[in-house]
Amino acid sequence: TSRRQRQMCIRDRNKPKIAVLFGGCSEEYDISLQSAASVIRNIDGNKYDIINIGISRHGVWHRYYGPADLIESGAWESYYKCPVAFISPSRDVHGIVEFTSMGTCCERIDAAFPVLHGRNGEDGTVQGLLEMAGIPVIGCGMLSSAICMDKDVAHSLVKSVGVSTTPSIVVRKNDDMHDIVLKASKLIYPLFVKPARSGSSIGICKVERETGLASAVSSAFEHDTKVVIEQAVNGVEVGCAVLGGCSEPITGAVDEIDLISGFLDYEEKYGARTATIRVPARISESLEERIKQTAKLIYRTLECSGFARVDMFL
């Protein structure tokens, strides 16, 4: 693109340009839309120039000029002004390339906020593109995102610094099912079978006895080629937000997830049919402080930056 074409897209340089990325070629596409709509509504437009970049379920990138309501409803692609656009890996561009009726034009971005969930967005792929382009990333970077997305790798790292993890095994899609069942026999039922690199509890099954293991593993392999099988933890799930960027990370209040039955699957996580989130958690001050310190340790161990949420069991 020529310098003149690039100048076509220049806006008010007094306000930093923040690109909000949403959607994505992921099973968690719908959740990303809900999150992005909330983020967009809460960014101060008087301070920042918001550039919305939507990624379709099929992986097509667009510059979206419409309201947040259409993102939330899932109808954003039908908006009349939604041209194809993408983030250029070139540091010379340092932003997006947009295809318009007048040709292509470029617009510089000061920072990018990937509000993407799951594979192809939360796993380091988009973060790597942004880092290569020289665009600052709001949230965790490429390495941390990739580490946190893989349950096996994340658990191994936090275990190495003294954080307790439940006994587990890792199996691969080309493993013989008989060998998988035999390998899992050293664990105590009930077990949880989880795709190693899937979020929002998608593909997770709770298995009460050995007869149900093969079916659960086959189901998990539909979402990933790597599966974690772990012992269930009989405890209360707690968690807190951690915010970095300063010498000492800041933690939010500790919350507690109160479940009447079952586990926190996709429907419970986003529909809260029977789950109740209690803030603050019903715990002692000393235990709350221990949880916060453990959350900070995990945050540092997994190389997190910006904001993160750390969950654990008591």
Language-model segments: which ranges?
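Active-site nucleotide/adenylate-binding loops and adjacent lid/helix of ATP-dependent enzymes
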Residues: 14-22, 26-27, 34, 102-106, ...
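ATP-dependent carboxylate activation and anion-phosphoryl transfer catalytic cores
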Residues: 13-16, 22-25, 162, 282-314
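ATP-binding N-terminal substructure of ATP-dependent carboxylate-amine bond-forming enzymes
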Residues: 11-138, 142-143, 147-149, 153, ...
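Short hydrophobic/aromatic-enriched beta-strand-loop microsegments
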Residues: 136-140, 165, 250-251
